[in-house]
Amino acid sequence: MEYLLSIDQGTTSSRATLYAASGETLATVSRPLVQHYPNPGWVEHAAQEIWEGQLACIAEAIAKAGIAPAKVAGIGITNQRETTVVWERETGEPLHRAIVWQDRRTAELTESLKEQGLEAMVRERTGLLLDPYFSASKLSWLLDRVDGLRRRAERGEVCFGTIDSWLMFKLSGGKSHLTDISNASRTMLFNINTLEWDEELLRLFRIPRGMLPEVRGSAAGFGHTSAQVAGAEIPIAGVAGDQQAALFGQGCFAPGMAKATFGTGAFVVMNSGARLGVGDGVLSTIAWQLPGEAVQYALEGSIFIAGAAVQWLQEGLGLIASAREVEALAASVSDSAGVYFVPALSGLGTPYWDPYARGVIAGLTRGSTKAHLARAALEAIAFQTLDAIRAMEKASGIALKELRVDGGAAADNLLLQIQADLLGVPVLRPRCTESTSLGAAFLAGIGAGVLDTSAIAAQWALDRRFEPQMERNLREELHRGWQKCVRLSLGWEKN
């Protein structure tokens, strides 16, 4: 039997899962990750804690499965994207805590660049919007604020990387300073047209070229683990950012195929093929590159508040005792009776990108109940997903035929039925909803030569299919009501 080890380093936890090449889960281990909030709007992780926790997960997962490390055909790495790490090249010691993708400390810098009229140039080269979300401004901040860091970086003594790069460096015993093309595309320093680090962007953010990792395809081979670190020299065979890995794990290999990951927030990603789609309000990014094949691009939508809207009903309003109760409460009424909830509790993402939007509850009458509000919260997740997908369809010129879903909230049958009704296409929930981890393992399988995409596509198994049951006229009427409420929320804090 061939074994594949998936390393899934996320925002709140580190995980290692051992799979058979068939996709069967043999063992999984996870550890929570401490969040550090040194100032309002700042979010940091201790890079050394990430490494030590991940290493412990790897050892425990292999031991739990009862196999020797040398039996692992390949390791796949997937990770929280954009999170920025700097470390000393010679010792591998972190030189600052990792600045997490959620961190907003560089908002002034990105606003200043927008005011200089540079967003169109950045968008054209990277597919991204000028926002603190991405790595470039975080790295620029570190170089300017950490004593002596810029000087040392210019001397070649400092490495920069996203979390995948940091883990590969440590796993290889300092031999591999690499990243994959999907993670590189999220730094705002990588040109997704030329597929190279962009010299003009490096000058704009004042980044020394020598601190950047070498970029490789997503299953191109990334060296081996050190035997001292992992107990054997195991090939590091596949790497992708978390959302790209989830798209791969869902078997979305053809242009127009899409997945939505429903968690605290939600991410919607559509495969746009070898063509780079560009559209208002959606991000253009690299999905992956397989050996001997052209780069595959993707369109991405970010929804800031999804499951967190349900959490707010529980913690903020006390309408439910636990998030698990929301489905039954929402199902106790046949519709939301005209109630809409725009959960812009921290602004709105795709396609509005308005940090000044604030939450709106509208359409209340004397007959409105907490059940109507619970249903409106589920509808809000589905409406936001609909808005993102419509923007993607416009950008790609491809009409969505079905939506594959994963993440914690994908267990909510009512949410998925509402989603199918509002989209007007089937929503498919797979048996395995750990698509991110599975996608990394599949990439490792390709890199190690034990899998191909046809074998992976054949492994995808359906748990349940949700067919749309709503008439088109009603769907469009409800969406018009949603858009009316969104307009109320936009710019609320600024205006």
Swiss-Prot record:
GO terms for cellular component: cytosol. PROSITE patterns: FGGY_KINASES_2. It comes from the Bacteria. Keywords: ATP-binding, Glycerol metabolism, Kinase, Nucleotide-binding, Transferase. Pfam families: FGGY_C (PF02782), FGGY_N (PF00370). ATP binds at residues 11-13, 264, 307, 311, 408. GO terms for biological process: glycerol catabolic process; glycerol metabolic process; glycerol-3-phosphate metabolic process. It is an enzyme of class 2 (transferase). GO terms for molecular function: ATP binding; glycerol kinase activity. Belongs to the FGGY kinase family. NCBIfam families: glycerol_kin, PRK00047.1. This is Glycerol kinase. It comes from Geobacter sp. (strain M21). The lineage of its organism: Bacteria, Pseudomonadati, Thermodesulfobacteriota, Desulfuromonadia, Geobacterales.
